[in-house]
Amino acid sequence: MKFDDLRDFIGQLEERGLLKRIKQEIDPHLEMTEISDRTLRAGGPALLFENPKGFDTPVLTNLFGTTQRVALAMGQDDVAALKEVGKWLAYLKEPEPPKGIKSLWEKLPIFKQVLNMPTKKVRSPACQQVIMEGDDVDLTKLPIMTCWPGDVAPLITWGLTITKGPYKKRQNLGIYRQQLLGKNKIIMRWLSHRGGALDFREWQEVNPGKPFPVSVALGADPATILGAVTPIPDTLSEYAFAGLLRGSRTKVAKSISNDLDIPATAEIILEGYLQPGEEAPEGPYGDHTGYYNEVDDFQVMTVTHVTHRENPIYLSTYTGRPPDEPSILGVALNEIFVPILQKQFPEIVDFYLPPEGCSYRMAVVSIKKSYPGHAKRVMFGIWSFLRQFMYTKFIIVCDDDVNVRDWNDVIWAITTRMDPSRDTTLVDNTPIDYLDFASPVSGLGSKMGMDATNKWAGESDREWGTPILMDKKVKEKIDDLWQDLDILS
């Protein structure tokens, strides 16, 4: 199913009973977070707050609060079907020419979808129906949520930040949180390895001291939003991937104050620049770890223009101890990771990022083990293959008889197939999430790999245990008798 814009998606969710309109007056300061959090933990609907206290603009939260809604936003019926999206990305990351008629036929759906990758330019976009600039710009009029009692200021959480470096043809779209500083100032909190930060550094190399143009889209269509959080190849534009997801070309328009392309159907657009050297302390904020983060200096964005649709909707979220919206997205995106990893490492059977691990800090993987040391190869392969796993602190590798999504199975494998000294690999001085205060140095820490596989000759000199399995014929006989025995009724 295709969704041309956020409003189209809202309408479809409402028809399915997956969106609830809140007509009571609710304060964006803390109250919306509490309602959204209770709703998400109960597996409830997306929420449209129609009467935010002190503001005229309605607020949409919990949009991706269930894996079902994430799948729908990606044009799929359920989360399991997202593996097909992963297969597209695996192919686009390392394309192979068809090896015959059968191969051509199998790849035909991908080739057809590629036609939707180029963007479509729009001259009079909906996102520029209302234009404000200069003294008319006032970000304090937006119902920006303050999510937790210790948060220093209101925080923009779903800002789709658009940048372009001097060396790349494509633009970068990334989601970075943005602290409200004043009427026309926000802090751009991006980590040094993220696309926007890389573009900014390269810009300063070529244009020292000159302002760096930036546009921020709030409330883009769901395919474009999810394109910015999906592990696409570095050479692929998020707009192009959104076209693949949507099944139609992404509509973009030129920003008013710069040459950046913005989502034409977005609800609200912020345009402006980063002046090199202008920084401000960011935070503290409650984050997806369940803790408040440290205060650190980040670049300040000066907003020169605000454009929006008539009667815009403000898209927002909160982050906190899982489950929250980022962790739900992580569960859904997990299905996309599996085919990408399997293309590089065919021995991988399954891969799982437990949501309790704050989306990416722990991974459990099962493999068809083929030789001594195989588990260690897979550990280092995962850490280095995709940028998303640079910050994964713990990787547990199991055999293919272990269900990596069942902690009962995983803990059994750890406790019966591991020796803590022999089967634990520690790596020092590796990149770690800036928000990880447990690391000894900000942004730098260690990683642990755990080999919970059966050990082969060369890995252990002892006779290895054989798992207990019931005789197959006995199981079949009892299967036939089970209902008649009437034991559990």
Curated annotation (Swiss-Prot):
Any GO BP: ubiquinone biosynthetic process
Pathway: Cofactor biosynthesis; ubiquinone biosynthesis
Residues that hold Mn(2+) according to the record: N172, E238
Keywords of the record: Cell membrane, Decarboxylase, Flavoprotein, FMN, Lyase, Manganese, Membrane, Metal-binding, Ubiquinone biosynthesis
SUPFAM superfamilies assigned: FMN-binding split barrel, UbiD C-terminal domain-like
Residues at the active site: D287
Covalent S-S links between cysteines: none
A GO molecular-function descriptor: 3-octaprenyl-4-hydroxybenzoate carboxy-lyase activity
This protein's GO CC annotations: cytosol; plasma membrane
Residues the entry annotates as binding prenylated FMN: I175, Y176, R177, R189, W190, L191, R194, G195
Reaction catalysis annotation: a 4-hydroxy-3-(all-trans-polyprenyl)benzoate + H(+) = a 2-(all-trans-polyprenyl)phenol + CO2
Keyword Membrane annotated: yes
Major location category of this protein: membrane
Cofactor list: prenylated FMN; Mn(2+)
Cellular location(s): Cell membrane
Transmembrane spans: none
EC number of this enzyme: 4.1.1.98
Family classification: Belongs to the UbiD family.
Functional summary from the UniProt entry: Catalyzes the decarboxylation of 3-octaprenyl-4-hydroxy benzoate to 2-octaprenylphenol, an intermediate step in ubiquinone biosynthesis.
UniProt subunit comment: Homohexamer.
Name of this protein: 3-octaprenyl-4-hydroxybenzoate carboxy-lyase
Source organism (scientific name): Psychromonas ingrahamii (strain DSM 17664 / CCUG 51855 / 37)
